[in-house]
Regions:
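N-terminal acidic leader/helix
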Residues: 1-34
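Mixed-charge, Lys/Arg-enriched low-complexity segments
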Residues: 42-78
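Short amphipathic beta-strand/extended segments with alternating polar/hydrophobic composition
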Residues: 33-41
Length: 78
């Protein structure tokens, strides 16, 4: 698996990897991460992938991170 690009964002690290005919987009925020796999035969290029990973997509990821953080925090009784 190798890093092929990054998407700039002020609140999270977004890294695009390539491995076995798949693009893997990893979002990282604090102690949590989310990863999404896209088949290279469907997406065709990193440029097309970046069109998919738009602000609306990133906003849904951010909402999920908020839910994950609440669950993480609850696990420690905070």
């Amino acid at each position: 698996m190798r890093i092929i690009d990054r998407i700039q964002h002020p609140d999270m690290l977004i890294t695009i990897f390539h491995m076995n005919d798949k693009y893997i987009v990893k979002f990282e925020a604090g102690p949590m991460e989310q990863a999404f796999k896209f088949d290279t035969t469907e997406v065709k290029s990193v440029e097309n992938l970046k069109l998919i990973i738009n602000e609306a997509y990133i906003e849904e990821v951010r909402k999920r991170f908020n839910e994950m953080f609440l669950q993480y925090k609850a696990a420690f009784g905070s």
